[in-house]
Amino acid sequence: LVLREDFESQTFPPSGWVVKGTELSEDLESGYAHWSLNWNEVTGCSIAGSGCAEVMSDFKEGQAGISKEEWLITPAVQVADNASLSFTFWCNASSFMTNKYGSFLVKVSTDDGDTWSDLWNAASQEDIENSGLTWPWNKDAMGIENNWQKLTPNVSLEAYVGKTVKIAFYFR
């Protein structure tokens, strides 16, 4: 195990992690904003414990063309033989995929975050199936009552063995 983070600390982001994002105008960021998209430590998550990192897009009509990026970046880690990345998250996949409200990707950098390559894309059938999840992303295919589903993809890091990498959880 190279890195484990459960987001249970009162400090967010955790030591060594980086949060960055696009700031919108004050009228869109606060109060009656049409978009709410930030990484925050929240309580009441049902993954495990009381803390989690959350990124949420609250899409409403009338704000076409808004582009906001949010990043949660791990500290640099050395990738060992047979390493894989496993993370658990909740996703309203039916709404997310059907309405194209956003993009959720996991990215990797081998140059301390100067450049990023896609490692896993929530909109890619190949990435989803290769990580052990079910495609298509909708409540009927997933056999769930509501649209929220707890997911734990497993992504190979074989291409990065012996390298020092940073992993980014990216939402736009």
Where are the regions that the model predicts?
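Short consensus segments that form the blades of beta-propeller domains
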Residues: 63-65, 95-100
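Short, solvent-exposed loop/turn and secondary-structure capping segments
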Residues: 18-20, 97-103, 118-121
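Membrane-topology and secretion signals of cell-surface/extracellular proteins
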Residues: 90, 96-99, 113-116, 125-130, ...
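Extracellular glycan-recognition surfaces and repeat-rich motifs
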Residues: 1-68, 123-149
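Extracellular beta-strand-rich recognition modules
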Residues: 7, 28, 72-95, 104, ...
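Asp-box/BNR beta-propeller loop motif
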Residues: 10-14, 109-119
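Short, surface-exposed tryptophan/glycine-enriched loops
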Residues: 79, 136-166
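Short beta-strands within extracellular/lumenal beta-sheet-rich domains
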Residues: 63-82, 147-153
